[in-house]
Amino acid sequence: MIIGIGNDTEAISRVAEIVERQKSFITLILTPAERAAAAERKGKHQNEYIAGRFSAKEAFSKATGYGIGEKVQWQDIEILNEPNGRPVMKVKNFPYHTYVAITHSGDQVNTVVVIERLTLLEKMSIKLFPKRGVLS
């Protein structure tokens, strides 16, 4: 059952300007694994990656109905890519399943986060067939 949907749009250039002015922004927003993945990218692709993660975390806060800092911190949310490029969001101490979509067009990044409460059968299916159902 879907219990939350959040959307966010950011200007990639605006996020890049913040990163340039405030070097601590990346450390605040991105987890160590996300920072390592960002460091593997250069120029435009690095800016898209950072803006995408920032936007996705903002979308997550909208999907939950409370902002970052109230019940969850920036570092509690991690979005890494599977080998095929699909982003996967994991949230510390969060009992629900999350889905994230990140897309870039020109200077814009748009993200959507869906939060789902899984049934017992769905949870068992994930354990038995991890690649067939939703990812944990």
From Swiss-Prot:
InterPro entries: 4-PPantetheinyl_Trfase_dom, 4-PPantetheinyl_Trfase_dom_sf, ACPS, Ppantetheine-prot_Trfase_dom. It is found in: Cytoplasm. It holds the Pfam family ACPS. Mg(2+) binds at D8, E58. One of its GO terms (molecular function) is magnesium ion binding. It catalyses: apo-[ACP] + CoA = holo-[ACP] + adenosine 3',5'-bisphosphate + H(+). Keywords: Cytoplasm, Fatty acid biosynthesis, Fatty acid metabolism, Lipid biosynthesis, Lipid metabolism, Magnesium, Metal-binding, Transferase. One of its GO terms (cellular component) is cytoplasm. The keyword Transferase applies. SUPFAM superfamilies: 4'-phosphopantetheinyl transferase. It comes from the Bacteria. Its cofactor is Mg(2+). Its EC number is 2.7.8.7. The keyword Phosphoprotein does not apply. Its main location: cytoplasm. One of its GO terms (biological process) is fatty acid biosynthetic process. Transfers the 4'-phosphopantetheine moiety from coenzyme A to a Ser of acyl-carrier-protein. Belongs to the P-Pant transferase superfamily. AcpS family. This is Holo-[acyl-carrier-protein] synthase. It comes from Leuconostoc mesenteroides subsp. mesenteroides (strain ATCC 8293 / DSM 20343 / BCRC 11652 / CCM 1803 / JCM 6124 / NCDO 523 / NBRC 100496 / NCIMB 8023 / NCTC 12954 / NRRL B-1118 / 37Y).
